[in-house]
Curated annotation (Swiss-Prot):
It comes from Geobacter metallireducens (strain ATCC 53774 / DSM 7210 / GS-15). Coiled coil: none annotated. Residues 26-35 have a biased composition (Polar residues). GO terms for cellular component: cytosolic large ribosomal subunit. One of its GO terms (molecular function) is structural constituent of ribosome. Belongs to the bacterial ribosomal protein bL35 family. Residues 10-24 have a biased composition (Basic residues). GO terms for biological process: translation. This is Large ribosomal subunit protein bL35. Residues 1-47 are annotated as: Disordered.
Length: 65
């Protein structure tokens, strides 16, 4: 059996934690920041865990990470 290819876009966006969950960063942080409040920008800096519904599909995209 050949190796499964890693989806390079997903590899740059997601990381697996030690417990096997998948971590992601928030969107809406790259530009047009003047209209966003200080509080909103601060909260967007924190990372979060991918929803349970999406875990399986994303794990398939990054098999070796």
């Amino acid at each position: 059996m050949p190796k499964i290819k890693t989806n390079r876009g997903a590899a740059k966006r997601f990381r697996k934690t030690a417990s096997g969950k998948i971590k992601r960063n928030s969107a809406f942080t790259s530009h047009i920041l003047t209209s966003k409040t200080r509080k909103r920008k601060r909260q967007l800096r924190s990372s979060s865990i991918v929803a349970a519904v999406d875990q399986k599909n994303i794990a398939r995209l990054i098999p070796y990470k």
